[in-house]
């Protein structure tokens, strides 16, 4: 039987205890992180109540399985299936979605490397550069970058997109970008998987559009609210709207039936008044008293007013069109005069 080094046993024990001490356990890839950015990330994670521990993949796997057995949570073992590249264990009290967002927000720019895939479009901005004239001008021009020498410096004539998101950096372009000080890459902790409450979350699940989900929740809330009000399902949120709707419906029925209360009397009288005017319009003038005639006249003026405003507006537009046509004719005549002297 092969001898297992004591430091390995101790490492597995410490990792397992770490896993058992936090509700959220993440596997992260640290292989792309240089030493200094990695130390900064460790500090940020500690400041936010978590810990990052980097170890060998085999020891991390053993620690996860050991913790799963001791906690009686066999589903935790599934996390070990996502160990890849240079894995590290990140334990925290943040929920998986907040953790993913936190790690994405704390990614840092990095210099160009040949063969690396850029995460977003790379643009060389217009303007002077710190570069002195030399072979690099020809290299830029050969790659479609509009560069020329102005006042002893290499100047870019216009903003130029040299790479689209997902494209690979060539050695020639890497040299140019590094010379210009443009850092098209990002370094950070890449999430491999996160465990919480028996569920393992992968990056494609965690990478959500927050605003889209907020909009969806708001729409769902409004639909549920409207449904609850329409079926008169009382809750603390809907009871006021349900009572208001019931009151308005009862009032409408009472007005329709002519049932007089202090809430309906004004609407009933108004309805009767409008019915009276409609009836009066059908009668000869000699049968109407002066007060009724005044009311009918006032109603007619109110009805005609919007029509007059519309007609005035139409006349103004027609007048404006005529003036524009006359101006066009004058310009045409002036042009002919200039042409033929």
From Swiss-Prot:
One of its GO terms (molecular function) is structural constituent of ribosome. Keywords: Ribonucleoprotein, Ribosomal protein, RNA-binding, rRNA-binding. Residues 302-341 are annotated as: Disordered. Residues 308-332 have a biased composition (Acidic residues). GO terms for cellular component: cytosolic large ribosomal subunit. GO terms for biological process: cytoplasmic translation; ribosomal large subunit assembly. Pfam families: Ribosomal_L10, RL10P_insert. The keyword Ribosomal protein applies. Part of the 50S ribosomal subunit. Forms part of the ribosomal stalk which helps the ribosome interact with GTP-bound translation factors. Forms a heptameric L10(L12)2(L12)2(L12)2 complex, where L10 forms an elongated spine to which the L12 dimers bind in a sequential fashion. Belongs to the universal ribosomal protein uL10 family. Forms part of the ribosomal stalk, playing a central role in the interaction of the ribosome with GTP-bound translation factors. HAMAP family: Ribosomal_uL10_arch. NCBIfam families: PRK04019.1-2, PRK04019.1-5. This is Large ribosomal subunit protein uL10. The gene is rpl10.
